């Protein structure tokens, strides 16, 4: 260890045996759970509190530790260190691990032992990084699983339902980190969630949800489009609401930030190269129609309220959803100078180069020709009695459903027919489902995508516009 610790004797984690006493161990914290309270069976009406963490002192050895006690002690101990800190634990109780029961909820470790910390006998000291050998601190960047033992995001999507409920490992780059959202459960317990968007060479966006405070704190330190993570033992499930596969951080999960492995370095080079060329621009993601159950979107906004929400949510990456009763005030589908149909790559959905008619993204590392298809791609303005939202994105199948025609049918129309189609919307109020996210690049401060646009029922529109009570 470092010179500061030269005179101290530490027991290595590989030498731990059940019932050993009067020892000290040192290690870097690689995982940690939230504090939880449970009814105390011995003292009816009171609660006992606990949390656990995982420490590592060498590439091959790491062990779980847990502490039980009263609320003040446990919360104070938990707040004293975080993932990435180096700690010295004195006088822990060494117990034999019940592998089948404990590894169902705790990280799998190579040790057959676990540490139990007692308020009366054990102490935990956080070491300064200046005191600790850099070899010990570097362990935080070493995954607890083999560096090649992971699924790509594309593999997860391709396997689909067959991976539902499975616990696997994932290597991915961080695309965005959402703002933590706080809530209260039906039994009045406080909760929180944070959605992280991941991507890699095979998939441009994949959701991972953090429900515990420790993983949320860790996620807040990640730099979008710069950080790579190796997520060990994350749960994969099918999200019925969004009709896609997602990942969830659980108590077994250990996340390694910026892992120092060959595979991670390859991914890091990929994101650095594509950061410059905007290969994974949000434009691609906005093209694909999100499989959102529209019946779950209930908040009704005016244009003014949407703009106000943009000011309140400045700096937040999470998208919001809502309903707008408005007129389409700009719909340039009969203007020859405005292009509303574009060629897109059938593989990645990106707009292809018009001159070559080839996808510069998919063909960058491949000589195989990628087919293209025609797709609506237009910007519209939406206006109600409070203002106008400019440059809202209306694309793909949503645009086809809105206009009531396919791209090929639209291209076969005369200019007069296109003008008549346009005025069907300019004269009538529509019920519009929107996805909106704060964006400094957008004219209104909001990047807005239309999820559905249909002529509104006059009675329904009047009722909602007069109330505006659902926001």
UniProtKB/Swiss-Prot annotation:
GO cellular component: chromosome; cytoplasm; nucleus
GO BP: double-strand break repair via homologous recombination; female meiosis I; fertilization; homologous chromosome pairing at meiosis; male meiotic nuclear division; resolution of meiotic recombination intermediates
Keyword Cell wall biogenesis/degradation: no
Listed PANTHER family: CELL DIVISION CONTROL PROTEIN 24 OB DOMAIN-CONTAINING PROTEIN-RELATED
Name of a matching Pfam family: OB_MEIOB_N
A molecular function (GO) term: single-stranded DNA binding
Keywords noted in UniProt: Chromosome, Cytoplasm, DNA-binding, Exonuclease, Hydrolase, Meiosis, Nuclease, Nucleus
Annotated protein name in UniProt: Meiosis-specific with OB domain-containing protein
SUPFAM superfamilies: Nucleic acid-binding proteins
Positions of the DNA-binding region: 167-272
Family, as annotated: Belongs to the MEIOB family.
Domain of life from the UniProt record: Eukaryota
Organism, scientific name: Macaca fascicularis (Crab-eating macaque)
Record EC number: 3.1.-.-
Assembly information from the UniProt record: Component of a multiprotein complex with RPA2 and SPATA22. Interacts with SPATA22. Interacts with the complex BRME1:HSF2BP:BRCA2.
The gene coding this protein: MEIOB
Summary of the function given for this chain in its UniProt record: Single-stranded DNA-binding protein required for homologous recombination in meiosis I. Required for double strand breaks (DSBs) repair and crossover formation and promotion of faithful and complete synapsis. Not required for the initial loading of recombinases but required to maintain a proper number of RAD51 and DMC1 foci after the zygotene stage. May act by ensuring the stabilization of recombinases, which is required for successful homology search and meiotic recombination. Displays Single-stranded DNA 3'-5' exonuclease activity in vitro.
Gene3D superfamilies (UniProt xref): Nucleic acid-binding proteins
Compartments where located: Cytoplasm; Nucleus; Chromosome
CDD domains reported in the protein's UniProt record: RPA1_DBD_B
Claim: DNA-binding is one of the keywords in the record: yes
């Amino acid at each position: 260890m470092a010179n500061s610790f030269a005179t101290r004797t530490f027991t290595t984690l590989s030498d731990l045996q059940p019932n050993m006493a009067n020892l000290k161990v040192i290690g870097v914290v690689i995982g940690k759970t939230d504090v939880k309270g449970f009814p105390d069976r011995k003292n009816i009406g009171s609660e006992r509190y606990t949390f656990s963490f995982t420490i590592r002192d060498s590439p091959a050895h790491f062990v779980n530790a847990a502490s039980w006690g009263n609320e003040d002690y446990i919360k104070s101990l938990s707040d004293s260190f975080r993932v990435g800190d180096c700690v010295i634990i004195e006088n822990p109780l060494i117990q034999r691990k019940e592998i089948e029961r404990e590894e169902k909820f705790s990280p799998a470790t190579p040790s057959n032992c676990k540490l139990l910390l007692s308020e009366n006998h054990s102490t935990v000291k956080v070491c300064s990084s200046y005191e600790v050998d850099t070899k010990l601190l570097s362990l935080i960047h070493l995954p607890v699983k083999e560096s090649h033992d992971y699924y790509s995001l594309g593999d997860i999507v391709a396997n689909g339902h067959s991976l539902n409920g499975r616990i696997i490992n994932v290597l991915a780059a961080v695309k965005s980190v959402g703002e933590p959202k706080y809530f209260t459960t039906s039994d009045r317990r406080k909760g929180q969630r944070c959605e992280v968007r991941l991507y890699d060479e095979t998939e441009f966006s994949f959701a991972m949800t953090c429900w515990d405070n420790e993983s949320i704190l860790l996620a807040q330190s990640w730099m979008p489009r710069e950080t790579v993570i190796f997520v060990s033992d994350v749960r994969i499930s099918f999200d019925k609401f969004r009709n896609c596969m997602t990942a969830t951080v659980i108590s077994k999960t250990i996340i390694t930030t910026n892992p120092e492995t060959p595979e991670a370095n390859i991914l890091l080079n990929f994101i650095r190269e594509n950061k410059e060329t905007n290969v994974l621009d949000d434009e691609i993601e906005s093209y694909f129609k999100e499989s959102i159950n529209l019946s779950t979107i209930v908040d009704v906004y005016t244009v003014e309220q949407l703009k106000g929400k943009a000011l309140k949510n400045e700096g937040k990456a999470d998208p919001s959803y809502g309903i707008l009763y408005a007129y389409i005030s700009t719909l340039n589908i009969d203007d020859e100078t405005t292009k509303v149909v574009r060629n897109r790559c059938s593989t990645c959905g990106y707009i292809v180069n018009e001159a070559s008619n080839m996808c510069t993204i998919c063909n960058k590392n491949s000589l195989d020709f990628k087919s293209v298809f025609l797709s609506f791609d237009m910007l519209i303005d939406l206006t109600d009695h409070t203002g106008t939202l400019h440059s809202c994105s209306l694309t793909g199948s949503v645009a086809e459903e809105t206009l009531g025609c396919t791209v090929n049918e639209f291209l076969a129309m005369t200019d007069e027919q296109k003008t008549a189609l346009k005025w069907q919307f300019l004269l009538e109020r529509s019920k519009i489902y929107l996805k909106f996210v704060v964006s400094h690049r957008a004219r209104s401060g909001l990047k807005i995508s239309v999820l559905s646009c249909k002529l509104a029922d006059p009675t329904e529109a009047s009722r909602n516009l007069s109330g505006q009570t659902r926001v």
